[in-house]
Regions:
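Low-complexity, acidic/polar, glycine-enriched regions of mature
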Residues: 18-187
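Bacterial Sec-dependent N-terminal signal peptides
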Residues: 1-22
Length: 187
């Protein structure tokens, strides 16, 4: 009986140590993007409602498993008319494809706190592999709630055309979409 108890205790301890769960601090996070309009100006936007889960046992996050889900209907470019157009079948078709997801496949450390984040991005019913730059801004303990926190910046560029996202010519709205995400995680 002692052996079984010790075995169960070791198993539970192993599970706890193996994959530490990190959750998104939504008040300190933004999932943003920008595109070029008419080849002369940038238009910025974000998804106001998104969630991110990170599981990692290593302090440098090289073993992290990252899952992101964003509500397409929460797209916000500070212009209601444009936001409505982006939600329409001309672009995201939010009625048919209400969410976009990202699931990591690997994280490779490039140098000090810089990583290559590889995963599958699904939006508008299309899944494609993407490689993003990820920067670990730091880890610390929040003095107010005593939780461990970590901050990341994620940057990358995708093509609208890869996801069948709008037939508007690139001279009007760039095919390249720059992703800029800043996230703070709690453990």
């Amino acid at each position: 009986m002692k052996k079984i108890t010790l075995l169960v205790a070791a198993f539970v301890a192993g599970l706890t140590a193996f994959g530490q769960g990190w959750t998104l601090d939504k008040s300190h996070a933004k999932l943003g993007f920008n595109v070029t309009h008419m080849m002369v100006s940038d238009v910025e936007g974000s998804f106001k409602n998104f969630d991110l889960k990170v599981t990692s046992a290593k302090e440098d996050f090289t073993d992290a498993v990252i899952e992101l889900t964003a509500d397409v209907n929460s797209i916000n470019t500070d212009n209601e008319k444009r936001d409505g157009h982006l939600k329409s079948s001309d672009f995201f078709d939010a009625a048919k494809y209400p969410s976009l997801t990202f699931k990591s496949k690997s994280i490779q450390k490039v140098e000090d706190k810089k990583y290559k984040l590889t995963g599958d991005l699904t939006m508008h019913g299309v899944t494609k592999p993407v490689v993003l730059d990820m920067i670990l801004k730091g880890t610390t303990t929040n003095p107010m709630n005593k939780k461990n926190i970590a901050g990341f910046k994620v940057l990358g560029t995708i093509k609208r055309s890869d996801f069948s996202l709008g037939s508007i010519p690139a001279a009007v709205v760039s095919d390249e979409v720059n992703i800029v995400a800043n996230v703070e995680l709690n453990k």
